[in-house]
């Protein structure tokens, strides 16, 4: 059952949606419908889902190798809105730690002197 939820989307846009609107983003199997996704999230994470929005991002080409040309697998992206007083603690802490690491990398890149300039 959990195989249908592939992984949470962790980037700046999803973190902003989490903080401002209490929305979580997941990539899920293409075959799932909105009612199935809602039931799956409510059962697995024990939260109350207010709304489910879905979309299918465009396919991306694979690195061209003559023996295996084609596209990457398709997936469905889901935006789940929870009630204001509820959260998924594991995903929230995962996003916060990744955001902190990314901000640290940006600060290090800005403060380190550029070795190419001489």
Curated annotation (Swiss-Prot):
Subcellular location: Plastid, Chloroplast
CC annotations in GO: chloroplast; ribonucleoprotein complex; ribosome
GO molecular function: rRNA binding; structural constituent of ribosome
Main location: plastid
Stored InterPro entries: Nucleotide-bd_a/b_plait_sf, Ribosomal_uL23-like, Ribosomal_uL23/eL15/eS24_sf
Keywords tagged on the record: Chloroplast, Plastid, Ribonucleoprotein, Ribosomal protein, RNA-binding, rRNA-binding
Protein's GO biological process: translation
Subunit structure: Part of the 50S ribosomal subunit.
Family classification: Belongs to the universal ribosomal protein uL23 family.
Cited function: Binds to 23S rRNA.
Protein's recorded name: Large ribosomal subunit protein uL23c
């Amino acid at each position: 059952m959990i195989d249908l939820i592939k992984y949470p989307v962790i980037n700046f846009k999803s973190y902003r949606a989490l903080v401002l609107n209490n929305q979580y983003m997941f990539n899920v199997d293409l075959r799932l419908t909105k009612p199935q996704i809602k039931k799956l999230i409510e059962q697995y994470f024990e939260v109350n889902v207010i709304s489910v929005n879905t979309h299918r991002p465009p396919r991306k080409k694979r690195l061209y190798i003559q023996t295996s040309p084609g596209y990457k697998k398709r997936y469905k992206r889901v935006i789940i809105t929870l009630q204001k007083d509820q959260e998924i603690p594991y995903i929230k802490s995962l996003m916060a730690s990744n955001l902190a690491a990314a901000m640290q990398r940006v600060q290090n890149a800005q403060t380190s002197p550029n070795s190419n300039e001489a």
